[in-house]
Each structure stands twice: as C-alpha cells, then as structure tokens.
Amino acid sequence: MKKNAVHFGAGNIGRGFIGKLLADADIAVTFADVNEPLVDQLSHQQEYKVKVVGSECKMETVSHVTAVNSASEALIERIIKTDLVTTAVGPTVLDIIAKTIAKGLSARFAAGNTQPLNIIACENMVRGTTHLKQQVYQFLTTEEQQQADALVGFVDSAVDRIVPPLQAANDDPLEVTVESFSEWIVDEQQFKGEIPQIEGMEKTDNLMAFVERKLFTLNTGHCVTAYLGCLKGHRTIREAIEDPCIHAQVKQAMQESGEVLIRRYGFDRALHSAYIEKILSRFANPYLVDEVDRVGRQPLRKLSANDRLIKPLLGTIEYGLPNGMLLKGIAAALKYRNSSDPQAVELQQSIEKEGVRSTLARYTGLAAESVEAQQIEALYQQMD
C-alpha cells in the first residue's frame, strides 16, 4: 500500500528537496500552499521537473504529486488519512500553519484514526518541529493533546540543500534547480510507530551536533561570503567565493566556528576540514546563480543570539578560542545595505542613531562594553 504525505510549502525547497525525496521514495505527496496558481498547476500536471546541478547538470521528473490550497477542507481530509506531514515554509510561516495542523489532528482523532502520524518541520531553525508542536498544542483541547502525545511524533530535523530562485527566463513555473548535495537528518528518538524508509533521510540520536554543524559551517560561511561580497561589489556567491581574499577569510571564519564544534561535540578534525572544503566548493558551483542579496537578506535575524554569526562567536568566547574572522563577518553584516529589505533598513537606522555597539547590544545580545563589541566596532570603522 502506497504511503501518503502532506507537505506544507510548494515553493522551491518544498518541490526541489523534501517533496522530491518523498516522491522518490514512492510516497504519494500532496503539497499544501496558499499560492493558488501554483496549486492549480501542480494539481493539474501532477508532475514537475527538477534540474539537479553538481559537476554536471541532469534533469529529473517528479511525478505522482498533487496539491491543495492550505485553507481548504480538502487539506483537512488529507491530514485525517495521511501517514506523514512535512513542512518547508520558513520559520515565520510555521506559526501560521500550526492552526491548520491542529484542525487536521482534531478531525483525525474525531474520525477515529489511531494510526501513528509523524510531523517533520524541515526549516532553517533549531528544533523547529518542537517549536511547531508548542504552537499546535495551543489549538488542541487537553484530551486532544493526550491523544497527540500518544499518536503523533513531532520529529526535529536538520536540512541542507542550496535551492536558488529560478532564472526568470524559464517558461516552466514548476521547474526548480537544486544542487546535487543534500542532507536531511532526523531525530530518531522522536518518531511514533515505525520510522519511514526514505532514501536521503538520515537518522541520528544526536541531532544537535548536526544542527550546529550545518548552522556554524554552511550558514555561517554562506552569509560571511555574502556580506564580504557585498562590500567588494560582487553580485553572486560564486563571484564572491572566487575572490581569493574572500575565499581565505570565509574559510578562516568556518575554521574558527569549526573549532567550537570539535570542542563541543568531538567531531574529527580531518573530517570536519573536508566538510568545510566541500562547502566552499558548493559555493563555487557554476550552475547555481545565487545572489549575495538573497543570502544576506534579513540581517537582524542572522545577527540574533541563536543564529549563524553570534552563536559560533559565543562558542569561541566560551572555550577561549580565536574568533577574528567571525568578528569581521559580523562587522560586514552591520555594513549590509539593501533599501528593499526592511531589516537592513532598520539596522542602518539603528547604527546611524545609536552607533555600532548599542546596535550590537540591542540585536545580538552582546554587551556594548564587551571586548568583542569593541573589536567589531573597530573592524566596522576600517571597512569602506
């Protein structure tokens, strides 16, 4: 019997990454999205193309998929019967879909479905599914919460695949381009019932090590590349990382954050060094056109205490490790200007009004009088 999955978010990551892995594992996927034209087209065509780009390009077709509107009763009907729910909607939208998931669970319990259900949020956030669970439970009665405790697994995951926006020249709106590299790691301790066998979904009992490995390496390296690239006038991540000066600085920033991971989780230094090299080569992928503005956007979120710049910095402080290039990356983030990004505008207004160190204290939690804030301010002032 074919398994079913409901996947929230029919955007590039939904189609190009999670939806594709599910469909490749012979699971019937229903995408749920608010974008009506996209939903109509997916439910009409029931397939789409994915261009997978690594050392070469190959085109693959994902089939046996359909789509429903996130606000529809049809979605609730699907949740009543489904075996798996996944999301790729972005951290802010997670809170919005929680109510819909709760409604689906209520209907599922009312219909007497006692089969276990697993829910996996595939978002760029630490323990995103645990956060989603807290939001969902706000809309369930005490009795429903008890049923959910028994029957519903909220499974945290770490995901990694670069999926840039499609080039506008393409006339197929469903086609998506993804890199050949992908990593989807799930916390095997949180499943209810049997764990689905999905090629490309790895299980671990130490998820936090992998969440931080990705955050401190891929995400840290990506945004440092973007912010240093912006300062030198590069347009894309590839252009920036092929600048030898930026390449060396990004590599050093990832090595600094890597020392925190090695200390904290006991990662093997040689293997971690190879992981860093792999990421540098991914940034230079000639088939991925990823603009520095896309990777640099929402700087306030990226400068928050639990995110890709400050969290590794705090680790270097905790263990007394060198952090000069992480500090430089943070200074470059403070220089990020983009008039169409409200967070970038707010950041620049704050620096203008309150100065660098007060801005750091407000958005990152670093004390304004700390050595690190003073070093960041000095680096900021040296930048053009």
Curated annotation (Swiss-Prot):
The keyword Mitochondrion does not apply. It is an enzyme of class 1 (oxidoreductase). The keyword Transferase does not apply. GO terms for biological process: mannitol catabolic process. GO terms for cellular component: cytosol. It catalyses: D-mannitol 1-phosphate + NAD(+) = beta-D-fructose 6-phosphate + NADH + H(+). NAD(+) binds at residues 5-16. It holds the Pfam family Mannitol_dh. Its EC number is 1.1.1.17. GO terms for molecular function: mannitol-1-phosphate 5-dehydrogenase activity. It comes from the Bacteria. Belongs to the mannitol dehydrogenase family. This is Mannitol-1-phosphate 5-dehydrogenase. It comes from Vibrio cholerae serotype O1 (strain ATCC 39315 / El Tor Inaba N16961). The lineage of its organism: Bacteria, Pseudomonadati, Pseudomonadota, Gammaproteobacteria, Vibrionales. The gene is mtlD.
